[in-house]
Amino acid sequence: MLSPKRTKFRRYHRIRSKGTANCSNTIVFGEFGIQALTCSWITSRQIEAGRRAITRYVKRGGKLWIRIFPDKPITFRPPETRMGSGKGAPELWVSVVRSGNMLYEILGVSEVTARGAMRIASYKLPVKTKFIKKVKN
C-alpha cells in the first residue's frame, strides 16, 4: 500500500473536500486518463485496487501513472473507549480528491484497451469518473 515515508505531524485535521481542483486537472504524462467528477477521500487500498485492475486488463502493456498519493493519515479510536485521552492512532492513509483531479494516466495502449481498463478501475473507486483523451495541438 502507498504511504509517506515521513510526515511533519503524526495526526492531521479531517478537512472537508469540496470545490474543484486547481492543479493536476489535465493529462500531463500519458495519452488517456480518468478524471474525478466528485469530491471524496480515496484510501491507499482503493488506489492499489485500481492500479491492479488496470495492469491486469492491459496485460503488462503500456505505462501507467498514478497521479494521486495518500498523504493524509486518518485516525480511529478503539471501540467502546471512554472520552478523552487524546486522539486515536493513525489507521489508514487517504488522498483528498476534488472534482477535476486526474487519478490515473496510461500510455502505449489503444484507446479501446485504455477505455476498458479505466472503466474497470473506476468501479474500484468511491468517486464518479470520466475518461479523458489528451488533446493534440
UniProtKB/Swiss-Prot annotation:
| Keywords noted in UniProt | Chloroplast, Plastid, Ribonucleoprotein, Ribosomal protein
Q: Where found in the cell?
A: Plastid, Chloroplast
Q: What cellular-component terms does GO give this entry?
A: chloroplast; mitochondrial large ribosomal subunit
> GO terms for molecular function, please?
rRNA binding; structural constituent of ribosome
| Coiled coil feature spans | none
Q: Which PROSITE patterns match?
A: RIBOSOMAL_L16_1 (PS00586), RIBOSOMAL_L16_2 (PS00701)
Query: Among its keywords, does the record have GTP-binding?
Result: no
Q: Which domain of life is it from?
A: Eukaryota
Give the Pfam families listed for this entry: Ribosomal_L16 (PF00252)
Q: Which GO terms describe its biological process?
A: mitochondrial translation
Q: Does the keyword Metal-binding apply?
A: no
Q: What is its main location?
A: plastid
What family is reported? Belongs to the universal ribosomal protein uL16 family.
Describe, as the record does, how this protein assembles with itself and its partners: Part of the 50S ribosomal subunit.
Concerning PANTHER family, the annotation shows: 50S/60S RIBOSOMAL PROTEIN L16, LARGE RIBOSOMAL SUBUNIT PROTEIN UL16M
This protein is called what? Answer: Large ribosomal subunit protein uL16c
> What is the organism lineage in this UniProt record?
Eukaryota, Sar, Rhizaria, Cercozoa, Chlorarachniophyceae
Gene (UniProt): rpl16
